[in-house]
Amino acid sequence: MRIILLGAPGTGKGTQAKLITENYNIPKISTGDILRENIQKKNTIGKKIHNILKNGELVSNRIVCNLIGERIQKKDCIHGFLLDGFPRTQKQAEYISNLKIKIDYVLELIVPYELILKRICGRRVHTPSGRIYNINYNPPREEGKDDLTQEKLTIREDDTIEIVKKRLENYEKNSFLLNKYYLREKKLKKLQYFKIDGKQSIYKIQREIKMMLK
C-alpha cells in the first residue's frame, strides 16, 4: 500500500502518519524528518537546508526530490510506504510518477489557517525523543518540561507566527496545482483521492481513514 498524506503545516499529518504506518506496518517517509536529519549532520546540504527553513522558505524541488528518491528505493519500501509532507508541488508529484511508482491513495487533511496558527505556535518539542506537546491542547504536566525525562522543551526555530504565516502562504501557492493534478489522476482511475476534515478529533480522523483504506 503506497499512500501520500497531504495537508498544510499543522494539520496533524504527523500524528495520522504514525497511526497509519503502525496499523499497516509500512515505513513513514517524512520530508521534515529527512530534512532535519541532514541539518543535524551539519554537512553542506544540511547547512543549506537550515538557512532556507529558518526563513520560512521551501527547500528546492531538486534537493527534496533527490532525498526522497533515495529513501523510496530502500528495501523496506518494497511492500509500501507513506509519504508525509511530499509532494508539495506538481513537479514533485510528477517526479514520483516518473519513478514508475504507483500511488494507491492520496489523503488530504483540511484545517482552517486560524486553527493551524494556534496549533503550531503552541507547539513544544522534546528534541531527543521527538515527543510533541501543545500548550493549548496537550500541555506537559509541568510547564516547559518533558513528562518522562523532565528535560527542557523547546520551540522549533520555524514555529514563530511570522514564519508559520509564510509557510502557509507557500503551501497555498503550490497546493492549487497539486490538488488539480491528483483530481485528474483520480478521474483517470490511477489512484483514490480523499479530503478529510482535520478539525475532528484524532480518533475520528483515524476511523475515517481506516474506512477509506479498506
From Swiss-Prot:
InterPro entries: Adenyl_kin_sub, Adenylat/UMP-CMP_kin, Adenylat_kinase_CS, Adenylate_kinase_lid-dom, P-loop_NTPase. Residues 30-59 are annotated as: NMP. It comes from the Bacteria. It is an enzyme of class 2 (transferase). It holds the Pfam family ADK_lid. ATP binds at residues 10-15, 123, 132-133, 200. AMP binds at residues 31, 36, 57-59, 85-88, 92, 156, 167. SUPFAM superfamilies: P-loop containing nucleoside triphosphate hydrolases. GO terms for cellular component: cytoplasm. It catalyses: AMP + ATP = 2 ADP. CDD domains: ADK. Pathway: Purine metabolism; AMP biosynthesis via salvage pathway; AMP from ADP: step 1/1. GO terms for biological process: AMP salvage. The keyword Kinase applies. Its main location: cytoplasm. Residues 122-159 are annotated as: LID. Keywords: ATP-binding, Cytoplasm, Kinase, Nucleotide biosynthesis, Nucleotide-binding, Transferase. It is found in: Cytoplasm. Its EC number is 2.7.4.3. Monomer. Belongs to the adenylate kinase family. Catalyzes the reversible transfer of the terminal phosphate group between ATP and AMP. Plays an important role in cellular energy homeostasis and in adenine nucleotide metabolism. Consists of three domains, a large central CORE domain and two small peripheral domains, NMPbind and LID, which undergo movements during catalysis. The LID domain closes over the site of phosphoryl transfer upon ATP binding. Assembling and dissambling the active center during each catalytic cycle provides an effective means to prevent ATP hydrolysis. NCBIfam families: adk, PRK00279.1-1. This is Adenylate kinase. It comes from Buchnera aphidicola subsp. Schizaphis graminum (strain Sg).
